[in-house]
Amino acid sequence: GSVRTKYGTRNELITAVAALQQAGIKVYVDVVLNHMGGAVEKEKVMVRRVNPDNRNEFTSDPFEIEAYTKFTFPGRNGKYSRFIWDYHCFSGVDYAANLDETAIFSIVNNPYGEGWEDLVDNEKGNYDYLMYCDIEFRNPAVREELKRWGKWLYDTLHYDGFRLDAVKHISPKFFNEWLDAMRNEIDPELFAVGEYWSPGNLPLLLKYIEATGGRMSLFDACLQ
């Protein structure tokens, strides 16, 4: 980016990771792949309103909104990636700028499938959508860009593993493909632990571990 963040510079981060590893401490990066926020451009998108308590229930016919779904990262000028995130990369949004309305909107002009992705649980009907621009993992270009990004991040930081955010909202099929790619490219023993927030439901956590073929551990949310 073009502006230093409050968390320090890139070089400070690289130095901190190296210092931790030299002290025998493994570094796991906190990876958020479920959603994106802060787009710089609006696009006209066909959507349907969604019942927030049952995400499989659509409460309107398709209609057009203006949504912040185009991420061009102008400050980077294509330095790290020339991939452009637009509405084809997302399955839903939560804000219609032209209406100044906050709600859950399912994107319907989507060549990769109607509605939401298949998950292992039926909480809220389908809990694929969490917030902001929900990433569309059925789009093969998105999956390839996230693999490229994971490899770039490793080449930059040389991390030891992942803490995967909000995995309950992401299809296990994606993580099977992505983690296999990361381990093939980086290290077969690359560690991964997922945050599947479902306190008191151990069988559901075990179901997700089974669906991902043991590729990741999960935090024991039941202890909370």
What residues fall within each predicted segment?
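Active-site-proximal helices and loops of the catalytic beta/alpha 8
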Residues: 17, 21, 35, 48-50, ...
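Lipid deacylating catalytic domains
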Residues: 120-123, 131-132, 153
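Core domains of carbohydrate- and sulfate-ester-processing enzymes
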Residues: 47-126
